[in-house]
């Protein structure tokens, strides 16, 4: 039994809403996956801020129609397509998908779309090497902390240098008086 028009409109509206909140869309071929495997994929990407949507290519095309950011997605919509939508950790979702792909060996990454640009399979896989938001925060905090430590050492060193200079001068004066 097919979907009703109302149901299809709900799917398109849901996709549009998810796309508004997403930074990246990754399109995969899910042919050959069982329901349990699709559920496993969804379970793996959810903790890193991702959503897996499976809808007819026609409905996905309708959802991205008129939105310049997601237009390039249409070139990847062939056959059995699942769309992985990333709201938060771009690198984390690609890592989660690659882990799933390594275990199942049934899916194929077609490409992705980010900020209106089409990404090839290799470009999407390269996103896995990017540090997560938490790692970037830690790096920034470490850099700020090291700067403040250097400033504190520098401030402490100035009076010490002046004191050593005065001490050397007074010793020199005492030596010349003798």
UniProtKB/Swiss-Prot annotation:
Gene3D superfamilies: 3.30.70.1730, 6.10.250.290. HAMAP family: Ribosomal_uL10 (MF_00362). GO terms for cellular component: large ribosomal subunit. It comes from the Bacteria. Belongs to the universal ribosomal protein uL10 family. PANTHER family: 39S RIBOSOMAL PROTEIN L10, MITOCHONDRIAL. Signal peptide: none annotated. Part of the ribosomal stalk of the 50S ribosomal subunit. The N-terminus interacts with L11 and the large rRNA to form the base of the stalk. The C-terminus forms an elongated spine to which L12 dimers bind in a sequential fashion forming a multimeric L10(L12)X complex. One of its GO terms (biological process) is translation. It comes from Gloeothece citriformis (strain PCC 7424) (Cyanothece sp. (strain PCC 7424)). GO terms for molecular function: large ribosomal subunit rRNA binding; structural constituent of ribosome. Keywords: Ribonucleoprotein, Ribosomal protein, RNA-binding, rRNA-binding. Transmembrane segments: none annotated. Forms part of the ribosomal stalk, playing a central role in the interaction of the ribosome with GTP-bound translation factors. This is Large ribosomal subunit protein uL10.
